[in-house]
Curated annotation (Swiss-Prot):
Its EC number is 6.1.1.3. Keywords: Aminoacyl-tRNA synthetase, ATP-binding, Cytoplasm, Ligase, Metal-binding, Nucleotide-binding, Protein biosynthesis, RNA-binding, tRNA-binding, Zinc. PANTHER family: THREONINE--TRNA LIGASE, CHLOROPLASTIC_MITOCHONDRIAL 2, THREONINE-TRNA LIGASE. Catalyzes the attachment of threonine to tRNA(Thr) in a two-step reaction: L-threonine is first activated by ATP to form Thr-AMP and then transferred to the acceptor end of tRNA(Thr). Also edits incorrectly charged L-seryl-tRNA(Thr). It comes from Nanoarchaeum equitans (strain Kin4-M). Binds 1 zinc ion per subunit. It is an enzyme of class 6 (ligase). The keyword Transit peptide does not apply. One of its GO terms (cellular component) is cytoplasm. This is Threonine--tRNA ligase. InterPro entries: aa-tRNA-synt_IIb, aa-tRNA-synth_II, aa-tRNA-synth_II/BPL/LPL, Anticodon-bd, Anticodon-bd_dom_sf, DTD-like_sf, Thr-tRNA-ligase_IIa, Threonyl-tRNA_syn_edit_dom_arc. Homodimer. It catalyses: tRNA(Thr) + L-threonine + ATP = L-threonyl-tRNA(Thr) + AMP + diphosphate + H(+). It is found in: Cytoplasm.
Amino acid sequence: MRALFLHSNRIKVIARQKALKEADQLEKPEFDVNKEHLAVFVAVEHGDNLSVAEQLVEEIKKVLEKIGIKEKVVVLYPYVHLTNNPSSPKLAKEVLDKAYDLLKSEGFEVYKAPFGWYKEFEIHVKGHPLAELSRTIKPKKVKKEEGNKVYLIYDGEKEYIIVGKKDKILVKDYKEIENKEKLHFELPKDGIELPIPINQDFEKMVLKEVFSEGEEIEKNPLNDVAKKFGFEWEPLSDYGHMRYKPYAALMVDLVNDYSIKIAKELPFPVFIVKGTNMFDLKQGPVAEHAKLFGERMYEVQSDKSVFVLRYAACFQQFAIAKDLTLSYKNVPFGMLEVADSYRFEQPGEVVLAFRLRKFYMPDLHVFTKDLDEAVEQFLNMHKKIMEEIKKIGRDYELLINVASFEDYEKYKYIIEQIYKDVKKPLLLAIYPKSDQRYWIINIEYHIIDVLGRPREIGTTQIDLHNSKRFGIKYIDKDGSEKHVIILHNAILGSIERYIYALFDTALRKEKPVLPFWISPVQVRVIPVSEKYLEYAEQIAKELESKFRVELDDRDETLNKKIKDAESLWVPYIIVIGEKEIKNNKITVRDRYENKVYETSLEDLISKMEELQKGYPFRPLYGPMKLSLKPANL
């Protein structure tokens, strides 16, 4: 908030023309205060909240005391021109009304210039050193009074309340709470007393989600792996922004391609879109949806307005969907954008290639006709998410967030279906009821990384509210208009998090290796010496139309060349020397089988084609010859 305090003898205000729909209702179009008073010109700014009204009143009292005004006469004047970053008119009006009421309650004689009107005014300001003062008032952080979440472990038909040491229940206000069996999680980790078997990964997720155990570890092998493949912090940008060197850029684009491929294989039409990453916070639907992210909003000021940088593709896809003419015949359908996304994570919380302020999200929204269809597709999306993580040899632990206790009772049948699919305990977080939540059920899919920390990768949600907020409707069979129900889905998670999961999976193997399709270098051809370079280049050129192949033509020893290829986890290293040329064979160091063997080039090509089948392909993002590549690129 910006405030200008003017010690005045007189102010006359006349409302001339209504400017805003939120404008005050006028009792009188003008007032004239012809006595000593403090005129307070106020601009409420974006990011303020109602707490600034109380702070404004305190500043008014301080200024009156500082100037030495004995009469408690104050004129409040809304004056947006004090800032280039104004709040919404709704909030500005609420702040001014609250300040007015607070001053009245403390015995002040208060006048308020009408809000939302074009006005003319005359003012006579005194001429002493303290007659004109200004203040910038910062809002206090307002904690949401949501009560406590209820944490349950759901195991088939049974529910177990999670309690901590000394039976301190972490939940309250959950009906029939005493009818639930209790799980005693003793902290610190000195054992868990459980009536049901759970695996270690699930236990770690519970300890992290419920008890906030498990800090980031500075020495993280996953950081070293990410850097090796070219994922780095960009020091010339903001916290949490990365740069992507050629191998990293290639991997990101391959996951981009793969996310589109699997979306197009779903059993309904999926449309690929693109759009902007900035949305106007003065627009009602945008402002309402943005509130859900609070301090994690990434904002940009322009000459037009204050914009929020999107944290997924919701805004753009909903903005497109609201303009469509939809029939029941068009629904269900999906909309996908691999969206550059922004979240204002705290500097100390960012994690290379995982928790970022800017990342890429293959964000898929599915628009359905009704709840039955939404639940059907929700279960399909769940199965697809589980299928994709199993392709890389992993499994997820599930945290299911439920919007309210009422929703838990109403939609428990969905959770039962999820349980029947995964056949293992689920962690449920049941929230107190709130109008702020747009979803009724929100599933987070977690892996546990090599350091024992839960890492959310995929997600799916049922959204009952945004179609009404944005006005997304279809015409039903009977000719009536109905709002769609929306599913939010990240089948792979963000691109960076999916790659993080691939790195984490690779580190668990005897010899770390990535899936063939996403290995930035799939084959490296190494001549034993310069004498065999020409033949090695012929081999490389024969492969490069189908595979990403590099030729190590550097003036280095054979051992050095092999070591460098091994450090990059290259799946197939082909060594070419006198024996290979003479026998018309190649010697292959096979990282998947952890073997060295002789084979024909044709047999190796067949093996690699089988590994590549069903996945996207892109060529190298650099030259084939390593001699042309700068060091550290």
